[in-house]
Amino acid sequence: MAALDTFLFTSESVNEGHPDKLCDQVSDAVLDACLAEDPDSKVACETCTKTNMVMVFGEITTKANVDYEKIVRETCRNIGFVSADVGLDADHCKVLVNIEQQSPDIAQGVHGHFTKRPEEIGAGDQGHMFGYATDETPELMPLSHVLATKLGARLTEVRKNGTCAWLRPDGKTQVTVEYRNESGARVPVRVHTVLISTQHDETVTNDEIAADLKEHVIKPVIPEQYLDEKTIFHLNPSGRFVIGGPHGDAGLTGRKIIIDTYGGWGAHGGGAFSGKDPTKVDRSGAYVARQAAKSIVASGLARRCIVQVSYAIGVPEPLSVFVDTYGTGRIPDKEILKIVKENFDFRPGMIIINLDLKKGGNGRYLKTAAYGHFGRDDPDFTWEVVKPLKWEKPSA
């Protein structure tokens, strides 16, 4: 057990071959294709998959000429689903498409059938979204989440570059970190447990799997300072994981929302991101809330921060904005809330402009659909840019 002044916290991740993540990636690949040709596309694209089948369905209004079947097959192929024995054959599986136009009732309420100015655009739905930041890592993200996510990305890297040729696309990771509470801030002490369950071919032994995962996945990802002789490793603890991908489990868009965000830290309003254009505040509201929380922590105003924003369908102004710094703020939270409101425009149309969220192409949203939407060093992740905050510092 951890000492009394410390505690254990666990985050998990799945890599791009997990069936739910496959669906997220297909949905966001469709969104990218729509926005690349028509930045005003309205997209709500869901994907589901099971053995030998992928289906895309939802509501899309776009001037883009989108070949849905081609996008599905390309996305699955790029993940590594190239034959039935790895879980799905991208070139021969069934692809079903059931796409309709956006409801005219929603269209008139949100964007007035494209007649409203940006500042007048209403939220695409009701809901509440959260952004979170913490000073425990350079990314200003929780360490347990960062490590679980990077282990998953590394699994894919060593599969695709041939370092571990026995790997197959599906896989899950989980990291338990021992933390110390420092007046509300979270200070990582050590990694308590590392769990990796990865799909593999028939040829490899469990001993080889464990040795390769330690050498080629865990060692390059987890800093040495966090590992000690007491760290526990569970490497493919079920003993066999040959059947995977959609053959092993059904998949659905929007089933991995905690993996997409903060690994269980902070809070979540419940709305998924993938397959949604930026008028959907589930996505754009969460992105600007992350930028606000990150900017507060990066500025030194707090060591830890959560921001909540809420909306009503068709209404531009948020219903509420909330800030909590968990007792780590240098100034009172009500002052930090004032700074957030003065520096960030939470109206959906203005979020879209300020974060350039209509820009498709370059696989922009597809990139977000695996290995997390936050804490990534990529110019397409505009919400990760720290905004210099304007505020009146109280006189000494």
Curated annotation (Swiss-Prot):
EC number(s) in its UniProt entry?
2.5.1.6
Q: Where is the signal peptide?
A: none
Q: Which cofactor does it need?
A: Mn(2+); Mg(2+); Co(2+); K(+)
For this chain, the family text in UniProt reads: Belongs to the AdoMet synthase family.
Pathway per its UniProt entry is: Amino-acid biosynthesis; S-adenosyl-L-methionine biosynthesis; S-adenosyl-L-methionine from L-methionine: step 1/1
Instruction: Kindly provide the name given to this protein in its UniProt entry.
Output: S-adenosylmethionine synthase 1
Q: Which NCBIfam families match?
A: metK
Q: Which GO terms describe its molecular function?
A: ATP binding; metal ion binding; methionine adenosyltransferase activity
- Check the record and name the InterPro entries matching this protein: ADOMET_SYNTHASE_CS, S-AdoMet_synt_C, S-AdoMet_synt_central, S-AdoMet_synt_N, S-AdoMet_synthetase, S-AdoMet_synthetase_sfam
Species assigned in the record: Oryza sativa subsp. indica
Entry note: cofactor:
Binds 2 divalent ions per subunit. The metal ions interact primarily with the substrate. Can utilize magnesium, manganese or cobalt (in vitro).
- The entry marks the following residues as binding L-methionine, namely 59, 102, 249, 280
Enumerate the residues binding Mg(2+).
12
Biological role: Catalyzes the formation of S-adenosylmethionine from methionine and ATP. The reaction comprises two steps that are both catalyzed by the same enzyme: formation of S-adenosylmethionine (AdoMet) and triphosphate, and subsequent hydrolysis of the triphosphate.
Q: Which reaction does it catalyse?
A: L-methionine + ATP + H2O = S-adenosyl-L-methionine + phosphate + diphosphate
Q: Where does K(+) bind?
A: 46
